[in-house]
Amino acid sequence: MDIEEGGLTVSVPEARDGASEGTGGGVFFNPTQELNRDVTVAVLRAYRDREPRASSYLDAMAASGIRGVRAAAEGYDTTCADVDPDAVELAAENLAANDLDGETVHRDVNALLYENVFDVVDLDPYGTPIPFADAALANARNLVCVTATDTAPLCGAHLNSGIRKYGAVPRNTDYHPEMGLRTLISALVRTAARYDKAARPIVSHVSRHYARTYLELESGAQVADDCIDELGYIDNCEDCLWRDPTHGLIADPVDTCPVCGSDRVLTAGPLWLGPVADPDFARAVRERVTDDMGEAKRARKLLGTVARELDTPTHYDQHRLYKAWGEPAIGMDEFVDRLRGAGYEASRAHYRGTAVKSTASIPEMRDAILGNEGDADGDAD
């Protein structure tokens, strides 16, 4: 069957009975990842302005070839690789059907990457990208784009699996989407550092059961060390929601929460504690979203939020805070405005509609929010 995406027409598998369109047996196509692909195209457009020499693109798990086709339409010298010969054939047909140049290769991507160098490598596997991370980060020149769909291990819901795959201890906290993203980036940064490379996230997001990050590479032991310095641990109180990030690779967990005295404190790490995006680049990516994209509205909203988001290592769930405070919640925009009015930095966060970031501690937030409510009640009298 044929589908249209980003102004292009590609053939995808027929749907099985009861399955979503295009998700039939054999070659896989995921229609729910259109937002992911739209943002990827916008990133490729913006990155060409940032690094004009970046010209070659590897779609490392091509399947139908939709990512490679869209990259080729942007003028990238595209290679589509897959271990499934049917996928390679379908990707070639889709390139030809759109009058686009590109190479299709029946190869294991790890072997391919140790024989060829690409400016941009896109890893979009089913599940964890870790089996492909070494080859990609060691051999890409400029940019590695990574999707992870195994969100339960990443966020700590499947703790042992997360430890095995990512070499970190993720914890299932009230900010679990961000926990997963920072666990993923930590593993990728540590992998790149083994090859004396810095891997810095310039755009990242968590959407619909997957995490996605775009890592810009720079060679050199010193810059790799600088990235390692952005790793650390976070102590989290399960009762009052206190959390404390600490940079460094040696954990020093606390026994009790310094705010409420609870001994239910979880320590997570090593996590990436640095920014997950470059705000200027995120804004540039947003500007390169075009109306022919099926998820243009969502992409612009997402990227706008990412660009404005504070780079503090964790977000708070406003509903969870109000539950702890025993008060009815106010609107999110008013919540953020009250924090800013009290002198704290604050922003919404893209992870969910009730996600907020602030430089205020939880007691400071409570005073800023509920104190204002008390003042408002007094004025009304």
Swiss-Prot record:
Residues 1-30 are annotated as: Disordered. Gene3D superfamilies: N2,N2-dimethylguanosine tRNA methyltransferase, C-terminal domain, Vaccinia Virus protein VP39. Its EC number is 2.1.1.216. One of its GO terms (molecular function) is tRNA (guanine(26)-N2)-dimethyltransferase activity. InterPro entries: SAM-dependent_MTases_sf (IPR029063), Trm1 (IPR002905), TRM1_arc_bac (IPR022923), tRNA_met_Trm1_C (IPR042296). GO terms for biological process: tRNA N2-guanine methylation. S-adenosyl-L-methionine binds at R37, R67, D82, D108. It is an enzyme of class 2 (transferase). The keyword tRNA processing applies. Residues 1-369 form the Trm1 methyltransferase domain. Zn(2+) binds at C237, C240, C257, C260. It catalyses: guanosine(26) in tRNA + 2 S-adenosyl-L-methionine = N(2)-dimethylguanosine(26) in tRNA + 2 S-adenosyl-L-homocysteine + 2 H(+). Keywords: Metal-binding, Methyltransferase, RNA-binding, S-adenosyl-L-methionine, Transferase, tRNA processing, tRNA-binding, Zinc. SUPFAM superfamilies: S-adenosyl-L-methionine-dependent methyltransferases. It comes from the Archaea. Dimethylates a single guanine residue at position 26 of a number of tRNAs using S-adenosyl-L-methionine as donor of the methyl groups. HAMAP family: tRNA_dimethyltr_TRM1 (MF_00290). Belongs to the class I-like SAM-binding methyltransferase superfamily. Trm1 family. This is tRNA (guanine(26)-N(2))-dimethyltransferase. It comes from Halorubrum lacusprofundi (strain ATCC 49239 / DSM 5036 / JCM 8891 / ACAM 34).
